[in-house]
Swiss-Prot record:
The lineage of its organism: Eukaryota, Metazoa, Chordata, Craniata, Vertebrata. Residues 27-71 form the WAP domain. This is Omwaprin-b. Disulfide bonds join 34-59, 42-63, 46-58, 52-67. Residues 1-24 form the signal peptide. One of its GO terms (biological process) is antibacterial humoral response. InterPro entries: Elafin-like_sf, WAP_dom, WAP_four-disulfide_core. Expressed by the venom gland. The keyword Secreted applies. One of its GO terms (molecular function) is serine-type endopeptidase inhibitor activity. Keywords: Antibiotic, Antimicrobial, Disulfide bond, Secreted, Signal.
Length: 74
């Protein structure tokens, strides 16, 4: 790959990283709470609720970010 192509790719990746959080910042969080922390190694499966399918939420458990079905508490 030429240096110009590599520079373009790097620029596009940087732009994508900067714009991704902004696009979901104005959206409200999905309803419900995250279930208890799973016992598994660190994984980064999602960045926010809107990167998860359906009603699932992006739940943060320290070094684990994963899509989980929400729990609802009355």
């Amino acid at each position: 790959m030429s240096s110009g192509g590599l520079l373009l790719l790097l620029g596009l990746l940087t732009l994508w990283e900067v714009l991704t959080p902004v696009s979901s910042k104005d959206r409200p969080k999905k309803p419900g709470l995250c279930p208890p922390r799973p016992q598994k190694p660190c994984v980064k499966e999602c960045k926010n609720d809107w990167s998860c399918p359906g009603q699932q939420k992006c739940c943060n458990y320290g070094c684990i970010d994963e899509c989980r079905d929400p729990i609802f508490v009355n």
